Amino acid sequence: MSKQKHSASSGRWLKEHFDDKYANEARKKGYRSRAYFKIDEIQTKDKLLKPGMTVVDLGAAPGGWSQYAAKIVGDSGQIIACDLLPMDPIAGVSFLQGDFRDDAVLEALLDRIQPLMVDVVMSDMAPNIAGNNSVDQPRAMYLVELALDMCRQVLAPNGSFVVKVFQGEGFDQYVKEVRDMFKVVKIRKPDSSRARSREVFVVATGYKG
């Protein structure tokens, strides 16, 4: 029974993916993923990225956000990206494969950043979905807390933060925590985000340091 349910769910995801105009457009234009369009919509509204900036991209693979950010920050800027999964090289992006929850990986990541101060921390991290919200939501909230902790370690005063968050238990408290750390906080749901998804993006500017 559960196997049939899983198969039906997988088939629905595949159909949705191949019918998805954003996924199709990403393939046509050579973008790493449909996530490219999400950060593009956020950038159009909030202007987080500028030439010459230093940016940290957490949960970077397959590279949609890093690919987008690298075009904006240009040769005078720098993108430091990290993910558990491998990622094909992108010009202007320094990629570290590993779990930054591990001390050795975190140290290596911080070594690549320092002595620079980071202008923007981006996180598109998401846990492996088990299909059980009582398990998935705490895992997702743990990851966004880690991203916020990264801001505390590396973000320059008045820096910016954008993070994917799944609405559910812990969401309101998390937004409150972000508001305590940043001057302006907005919740974005890009058109390119699937309507049925609980994902939204918390966009925070003016880090209080």
From Swiss-Prot:
It is found in: Cytoplasm. The keyword S-adenosyl-L-methionine applies. The active site is at residue 164. Disulfide bonds: none annotated. GO terms for cellular component: cytoplasm. SUPFAM superfamilies: S-adenosyl-L-methionine-dependent methyltransferases (SSF53335). InterPro entries: RNA_methyltr_RlmE (IPR050082), RNA_MeTrfase_FtsJ_dom (IPR002877), rRNA-MeTfrase_E (IPR015507), SAM-dependent_MTases_sf (IPR029063). Keywords: Cytoplasm, Methyltransferase, rRNA processing, S-adenosyl-L-methionine, Transferase. Its main location: cytoplasm. It catalyses: uridine(2552) in 23S rRNA + S-adenosyl-L-methionine = 2'-O-methyluridine(2552) in 23S rRNA + S-adenosyl-L-homocysteine + H(+). Its EC number is 2.1.1.166. It is an enzyme of class 2 (transferase). S-adenosyl-L-methionine binds at residues 63, 65, 83, 99, 124. One of its GO terms (molecular function) is rRNA (uridine-2'-O-)-methyltransferase activity. Specifically methylates the uridine in position 2552 of 23S rRNA at the 2'-O position of the ribose in the fully assembled 50S ribosomal subunit. Belongs to the class I-like SAM-binding methyltransferase superfamily. RNA methyltransferase RlmE family. This is Ribosomal RNA large subunit methyltransferase E. It comes from Vibrio parahaemolyticus serotype O3:K6 (strain RIMD 2210633). The gene is rlmE.
